[in-house]
Amino acid sequence: MRPQLALARHRATTAHLCSAYPFAAELGLGIGGVHMGTNLLTGGGGFAFDPFEAYAQGFVTNPNMLIAGEPGVGKSATAKTFIHRSVGVFGRWVAIADPKGEYLPLAEALGLTVVKLHPGGATRINPLDAGPATHVDAAEQVRRQSEMLVALLGSVLKRDLAPVEDAVLGGALRVLASSGVAHPTLADVAHLMAAPTADMVPTTTTDADLAKAVESIPFALGKLLDRSLRGMFDGPTNVGIDWHGPGLVIDLSAVHHDHEALTLVMVAATAWLQTLMATPGGPRRIQVLDEAWALLG
């Protein structure tokens, strides 16, 4: 007995049927890269993606990715799949800011260095550190450090820095850059901001005026140096990093449930990671910011 078609017959014009027959699957974006899975919206073809290739071929204007969705839809699984295949197959270098501590099994599988930070701990990273980025000149380094500190202090103070505070902060960083200190720290900045001098900002007249204008800054830095977040960013970097390895994970799970602390730690840790990303030469690099909302304050 011949099998019967379960669906009712349908009659249509060739103008419509040509889009459905012969059955075909879309080729996707037409670029190579990491195989991410099956594209269920385009006939079941495979879907591959590589932000570097997409940028090189003009599909995107910058190689950034945003993975968004409701809880439980697979955002983290998608990110981990992309990282695992990018590093394991394509030899990319990866730096991950991990607020939940959920990338540790992936780090073990790929041989990534794990840096675990927690208040009162012995492991420290210096957000002002240039890392291996020795190609950056002093002026550019001061600019990067200033941008990071403005974001960090703004988050602590819950306001934008006043123009005079911003100016004195930049002056303090320039003083440190010209002083010959190899690796200035947040403690060095706090020391200068506690007793600023008029030569740090030539447009001012007295040291006392400056000290009054920036009196909140040393106390704001104190949150990272000697109060609730001490032991994370209050000294030179003492982490052994294999610069020729596949990458690293910064485990921030110790402060994940403290929204204010997580924002500060993410800003500081991300600034440190960006110095690594800017180093010329070597493999193509990927920076992953899980829970990136924390950077928005």
State what each model feature region is.
Residues 50, 54-73, 86, 91, ...:
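Short, flexible loop motifs at catalytic/binding sites
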Residues 47, 57-59, 76, 105, ...:
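Short helix/loop capping segments that flank catalytic or ligand/cofactor-binding pockets
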Residues 21-41, 104, 108-112, 127-297:
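P-loop NTPase motor domains
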Residues 69, 96-99, 289-291:
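Short His-Asn-centered micro-motif
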Residues 1-68:
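Basic- and hydrophobic-enriched, low-structure N-terminal and domain-boundary segments
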Residues 65, 94, 248:
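Conserved beta-strand position immediately N-terminal to the Walker
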